[in-house]
Amino acid sequence: MKAGWREAAFNNGWTYRDWVPRAAAGTLVSEWLADRYRHSDAGLWQQRIAAGELDWNEALLTGDRALQGGETLCWRRPPWLEQTIPDQWETIHDDGDLLVINKPSGLPVMPGGGFLHHTLMALLEPTGARPVHRLGRFTSGLQVCARTPQTRALWSKQFRPDGGCRKVYQAWSQRVPGLELGQCLTVSSDVVERPHPLLGWIWGPEPFDGAPIRKRLSAHSELELLERRAEGDRLQVTITTGRPHQIRIHLAQLGSPLLGDPLYLMNREISATATPGDGGYRLHAWRLDGGEFALQSSFPTDWGIL
């Protein structure tokens, strides 16, 4: 294992709790869980029940049965192997409360997507700092954290659309049609929640095929073309809204997804086998401009296109 990386390791497992709505009465436990957690089908949930991993109202569930509605289900997930992660970073600012780091690509900020302890949140626990927002696992750059609830609340407010904080990223994308060097382009299309076979629902661009949309969020991005190569475009992207995967989605909406993005594809399609935590793209949180408070981070060593 090279320096600056934490080896893959087993955690101690985790207990997931779900309250069952009354409307689910009569549905088998395995079927309800399979619908809620699309990564596992009913047969796999039946295996977990047989293995003694599920509780019904705090008592062991000994067999698949019909739900009554209103009960609590607990899945005691056994320990699993968490992947290796980078665990070193550059500190950009630290005044004893506010902490801003240059997060390396590949480090998850919070639990999710197969990570529980191999996260920035867990690594920061001894310092008392906690993340204010969440960069994607494979997005590098400025990650704001704070040690007190007051400072976390202050910065969370600044990150809102009317908070006055400008977040400036750089990204490598497929060529953006009609955009020339130095030109800017405004993207104000909604980020929408649409079906996904593994996750149930996922945030993405508005589909061409009329697929159902569960929710919409307004989003605003400003693009500027900094460099054009045969392989793709290097863009500066400024956002005032912080929607889930906003930059990845807006570029896919334009038909110019991030180079190497395994999830958001051409023609506004979304991969049926990838998830938001999969890497391969290049997106860097470069600058934060909060008026009198401005910070900038250096790029990863492999940022350019070879």
Predicted feature residues:
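RNA pseudouridine synthases
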Residues: 1-306
